[in-house]
Regions:
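A residue-level marker of the well-folded mature domains of exported/periplasmic proteins
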Residues: 1-185
């Protein structure tokens, strides 16, 4: 779809480069991609925000292409706010707070007996990843998901009484914007 609607900005996907689980692997994969594609303007180190991502960022920095190659990935880095400011990261998805919270609330409600005929069934609860693409986005994430809980004490109590469908609905709404709106900010 992108290429059809953006004829002057064609996206070209490269063959994946396996980086392993080390910083060195991420660095070598990024270097290989940059060497094979001199016009490379975006890089998506997959597999999380750990060592391979750090290595890829370092390779882009060594090549003098910080800000020229947009780097995006998953799993928030501890210094993501600074990286968004200096241009070494263009965006990142992650902030998996909602996954353990919703899992805990599901188990808690099941143990309390709030879910009838639940035994042996599989339920899929979908929730959006949090996405940050600017220092302001990161400040919102840090404020509502790192420095405090994204829910008030009363909201957590209310959540502990939700039906499974209600919990699924609550999960779909989790976002930085939702937390800010609920806290009136």
């Amino acid at each position: 779809k992108w290429n059809k609607t953006h004829p002057d900005d064609q996206a070209k996907l490269t063959e994946p480069q396996y980086a392993g689980t080390s910083s060195e692997g991420g660095s070598k994969a990024a270097e290989a991609l940059m060497a094979a594609n001199p016009k490379l303007d975006a890089l998506i180190p997959a597999g999380g925000g750990g060592d391979p991502l750090q290595g890829a960022i370092a390779a882009v920095e060594r090549a003098g292409k910080t800000g020229k190659i947009a780097v995006v990935s998953t799993d928030f880095l501890p210094d993501l706010g600074e990286r968004l400011k200096n241009g070494s990261m263009a965006g990142q998805s992650g902030g998996h707070y909602c996954d353990p919270l919703i899992a805990f609330m599901t188990v808690y409600n099941a143990i309390k007996g709030n879910y009838k005929d639940f035994e042996g069934k599989f339920e899929d609860i979908t929730f959006p990843y949090l996405f940050v693409a600017s220092p302001d986005d990161y400040q919102g994430y840090e404020k509502y998901f790192v420095k405090q809980l994204p829910f008030t004490d009363q909201e957590l109590v209310d959540m502990s009484n939700l039906s499974l469908e209600g919990l699924k609905e609550a999960a779909t709404k989790i976002s930085i914007e939702d937390a800010a709106a609920r806290f009136g900010k």
